[in-house]
């Protein structure tokens, strides 16, 4: 039987340091380059980071199939893609969740979900979770925005109410993209991602790296 989803449960932390304000060493920092990857997609192809070299801006976001913060905000994300796709912004989704924690997050369900909803992004499967570790993915959804040189310029949430996107008052991702495309620095480059934690293989469903626990 799969574990019951409780989006409001605090992550399971493994050290007393979790209660202290410490540097976020687990996830990418502003200015870091996008780590390489090569992953299978729901369209039957395999994609590497270099396949998106022609795009001026690359938005990589970690997502899944089951999380209510994902399903509650997917249509808002779709609108963001449609708004910025004509400006050279490319969106790439990655599912790194363990299928042994939530069977809905397996690859066949990814294919089915894309077929049903027709989302305007590439949907990649990170079964080994190596890409999630390289990027330091914390939540689903968790967004990373990279400039033409593939340096990180924004990381965190897309909106402040992903579970009920119609109630969103702050559109952090849109603002970051608008500022960057206008040639301006991103005024708020880091926000806490809001969502379900990544489901790590062999870990409790609510486990997160200790150094992340105070910052999500």
What are these regions (language model features)?
Residues 2, 6-189, 204, 212-216:
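Chalcogenol-based redox active-site neighborhoods
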Residues 207:
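Short terminal or interdomain "cap/linker" segment that borders an active site or interface and mediates
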